[in-house]
Amino acid sequence: MTLRSMRNLLKHWRWFIPLLLFSSDAFAWGLYTHVYFAQLLLWAVPLTEPRFRRAVAAYPRLVLAGACIPDLSLVGRYHGAPALDATHDWEQTQRQLQQASTDAERALALGYACHLLVDVIAHNHFVPAHEKMWGETPLVTHAVAEWAMDRHIQHHLFATPAELCDAHRHQLSAFIEQHFDCTRESAWRSLRTLSCADSLLRGSRLHSACYRGACAFDDRLRQRFNHYLRETGGRMVQINRILSGDIPQWYAEAPCEKKARHRVGLCAPHQLRGRMPLPQNLFETEPG
């Protein structure tokens, strides 16, 4: 199979309607991948702020649960919580970190910040690169790349997003009510919908089908996915600057389509397929 064959397959976008129902520009990494990076934060990133080190030691699972909150932007509007549309905002993240008064709140805020930090690479590089390689069918390509990565790392998780949302629904709902203009009931309904949707899609095994198909069409997929995981993980130590009050210069939400295409257009085809150059310092102004 060739990349040309994959482009032809992706033209038949109607095959992927079930996937598109749960995919949007708000998502970059899937929920499984966000929990993976939050686990990496717990294990491998030395935090310089003592309060957050204490929070991680006391409530590690709340860090993982907090990493699921930003993706409520997909469902909040359907449960009377339109304020959840704006979850990928750095100033909102800073307010959460600064206002956290307990170890549990700090753990949730840390997981939330971790989500946004790694989304910089996903929105600005991972997703646009795969759209460039696999064909100009953005929503479908986005969904396939996202779910394929989730399947790539799923066996490394110690808890699924659905398990985390269900087990910590009271702490999550209270945290969301505190930081967004919504009721605790709306927050809980949004969490339940996100949890059920994630469980439904995992049960359907669509993510496995995406992974198998992508691997068949793209023989460098596993190598490239590991590159993104390694390089994104290597930049997670920069979360210490966020904890100290700094704000990255890169957006954690989807950039404009023209800008994203220009960025990946600067890379040679072999870089897109293998090791795309990524920004080293997320606090430096984005070039061009």
Across the structure, where does each feature detected by a protein language model lie?
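N-terminal leader/auxiliary helical segments
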Residues: 2-111, 117-288
